[in-house]
Design a protein with these regions (language model features):
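Membrane-integrated ABC transporters
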Residues: 1-64, 96, 115, 152-189, ...
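Extended non-transmembrane interhelical loops and adjacent amphipathic helices
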Residues: 2-36, 124-171, 234-243, 247-277, ...
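ABC ATPase nucleotide-binding domain helical subdomain, centered on the C-loop/LSGGQ "ABC signature"
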Residues: 446, 479-525, 581, 619
């Protein structure tokens, strides 16, 4: 598993030399700019809602102060009211002040849930906008190269983690930021009240004490976030191991291979690798700095309280001022603690937003080094002549080995071309280049002489129906799974059924509880799952649906890997009819498949080493003939363990073993 690298940590934290100027710059980068990003997010919540919540939070900040003032005046009026009796003016004043205090208290209780409900609406709006942005960023690249970049994966993981756990999201941070309006409005009002009621120096002293407490809390969280950045890679491992053990994907192997204990130990080890850095940082982050800041703050706050008591003892302030001073200082000190509605969510959101910003920058950096996507329309009927790989070379990003080395290959229009070779020969890479999932390192892929990089990628891909061996099993209905082959056109049920019939899966699908509308997942009510071979036919039907919608190229990458030999033979007996007039590329390790192709190409070491018809290549006695004979011998002895009934393959395949022996004479 990949762990965080030094480059993943905030640069200033790792490299900044001591000095006020650098420290100030680092603080701005770490604490100020991320908060400004959160402030800018407020616009996606709606101006009216944000303004209303701001006013509401100002009110929620002032109402507790009004309650403190009212109750303090109430305490001061009690002696006069008691002396005057219930019919006195002093008693009337006492009653009026009590009603004011009660009103302030009741308004606080009424407005708080209103603020919470509106805050949730703001959170949903902001988080929804950011989810859309993150999704748009990951869908933006034309190819899949950026999606395999380790730095991009780290930033994406950090960006979406808050959304996955649904707390500490940027939307919650926006709500928490507005909540700080209430907190700091209250603090400012209390500083003024203490200054007026007790002494002007006491107000700023209490305010400074509260800010010191707050700096200790927020400073610790900010330093903790640096540690969090260092363990992002390990966090991904923890998440992965948790998913493996909590879903049914690996349930069979976990039990059959006895992996329960091993997975539990691995999970604990990964989790400890995440937690240990925090434990090591705890004393440095909290113990000494927090004790120092708390001590200074308590001295300031305690000094204000003692000064208030001295003034009351010497008669310089009355009972009202004493009550007001004590209550105001106590309420102000309570503002120096941890803010659950703001602190954690804001810190996590700053991590997410910083990761999102780095994700944008990394994608921009990767795309800047790539050729801009073409915009030309794909001519109708393309390819009319041929698809050509013209001296194509390719190396995967970050890899040292060349996968394709000057490939010269022609796929004649309307014909079936097969590509064979050992694992790692570059067969699937050809498919990725043809689908523009990658761009060639050198050379070009051409359709009727035109570089396909000049075409609009989306238009070009509509011309290509692809079946990958590792196709996706979507948790959708059977009809939707097939119709995804041409998602750009309205779903045509008749065409869906026809594609299913051609792929040999229609009968099985129609027998499901809801037919084509049955969800292909047991996670949904009335849903079911299919066998591997049935899913393979769904994938084939998906590609055939694309052909029905106008695709001109069919690419089959190990198309029958999950079918038994007889089913494979039956499928390829129909293959020529299904793909008549279609330019097709067939990749398979089974020679019983490729022998039916019009043209066969042998790849080895990233180069084309042989090409021709099946009969011609067998007669040549070269690389293809040797591999064919080796596989035929395994078929004849029933040694190909991945096929059902493989001992009878010679019958199903029309005497493949006999033909191989004949070709080797």
């Amino acid at each position: 598993m990949t762990t965080g690298t030094p480059s993943a940590v905030e640069p200033a934290a790792a490299t900044a030399p001591p000095g006020l100027r650098v420290t100030w710059s680092h603080w701005v980068d770490e604490a100020v700019r991320p908060r400004l990003r959160i402030v800018r997010l407020l616009t996606s919540g709606g101006d009216g809602l944000v303004v209303f919540l701001t006013v509401l939070n100002v009110a929620l900040g002032l109402l507790p102060v009004a309650f403190v003032v009212a109750t303090s005046v109430l305490v001061g009026e009690v002696p006069a009211a008691v002396d005057g009796g219930v019919d006195s003016a002093a008693w009337d004043r006492l009653t009026g002040i009590f009603l004011l205090a009660a009103a302030a208290f009741l308004l606080t209780q009424l407005l708080t849930p209103v603020g919470n409900a509106l805050g949730q609406r703001l959170r949903r709006r902001v988080d929804g906008a950011l989810r859309d942005e993150a999704m748009a960023l990951m869908l933006r690249p034309v190819g899949i190269g950026p999606l395999e970049d380790q730095r991009i994966l780290d930033e994406l993981s950090e960006t979406v983690r808050a959304f996955d756990r649904e707390w500490g999201t940027p939307g919650q941070a926006c709500v928490g930021l507005l909540g700080l309006v209430a907190r700091y409005t209250r603090l400012l009002a209390l500083v003024v009240v203490i200054g007026v009621a007790v002494a002007w120096p006491a107000g700023p002293a209490v305010g400074a004490a509260v800010l010191l407490f707050r700096y200790g809390q927020r400073g610790g969280l900010r330093k903790y976030s640096r540690v969090w950045r260092e363990v992002v890679g390990k966090q991904r491992e923890v998440t992965y191991l948790h998913q493996v053990t909590m879903t049914d994907v690996a349930a069979k192997e976990i039990r059959l291979f006895g992996l329960s204990g091993w997975l539990a130990d691995r999970y604990v080890a990964a989790w400890e690798a995440v937690v240990r850095p925090f434990e090591r940082a705890r004393r440095r982050v909290y113990l000494v700095p927090y004790l120092v800041l708390t001590s200074v703050g308590l001295l300031l706050a305690g000094g204000a309280m003692v000064h208030t008591a001295q003034l009351a003892a010497t008669g310089q302030v009355g009972l009202t001022a004493l009550a007001l001073g004590v209550q105001a200082v106590a309420l102000a000190i309570s503002l120096g603690g941890y803010y659950p509605e703001a602190d954690t969510s804001t810190q996590y959101a700053m991590l997410s937003l910083s990761a999102l910003q780095r994700l944008r920058e990394r994608l921009d950096e990767v795309e800047a080094g790539q050729r801009p996507p073409g915009r030309a329309a794909v001519p109708a009927g393309t390819p009319a002549v041929a698809l050509t790989f013209d001296r194509v070379g390719f190396r995967y990003p970050g890899a040292g080995r060349t996968v394709l080395d000057g490939i010269e290959l022609e796929l004649p229009a309307g014909r079936c071309t097969a590509v064979v070779g050992v694992n790692g020969a570059g067969k699937t890479t050809l498919v990725k280049l043809l689908g523009r999932l990658y761009e060639p390192t050198s050379g070009s892929v051409r359709a009727d002489g035109v570089d396909i990089a000049e075409f609009d990628p989306e238009q070009w891909r509509r011309q290509v129906g692809v079946i990958f061996q590792d196709f996706v099993r979507y948790e959708l209905t059977a009809a939707e799974n097939i119709a995804l082959g041409a998602a750009h056109v309205p779903v045509d049920r008749a065409v869906v059924l026809r594609a299913a019939e051609r792929a040999g899966i229609a009968e099985a699908l129609l027998a499901l509880p809801d037919g084509l509308d049955t969800p292909l997942s047991r996670a949904y009510p009335g849903g079911t799952d299919l066998s591997g071979g049935q899913w393979q036919r769904i994938a084939i039907a998906r590609a055939l649906y694309a052909l029905e919608a106008g695709a001109k190229v069919l690419v089959l990458d190990e198309p029958t890997a999950a079918l038994d030999v007889r089913a494979e033979a039956a499928f390829f007996d129909r293959f020529v009819e299904l793909t008549r007039g279609v330019t097709s590329l067939l990749i398979s390790h089974r020679f019983s498949s490729v022998r039916r192709a019009d043209h066969i190409v042998v790849l080895d070491g990233g180069r084309v080493v042989e090409r021709g018809s099946h009969d011609g290549l067998i007669a040549a006695g070269g690389h293809y003939a040797r591999l064919f004979a080796l596989q035929a011998e395994r078929f004849a002895h029933g040694l190909d363990a991945e096929d059902d009934g493989v001992a009878n393959a010679g019958v199903a395949d029309g005497g493949m073993a006999d033909e191989a022996r004949e070709g080797n004479r």
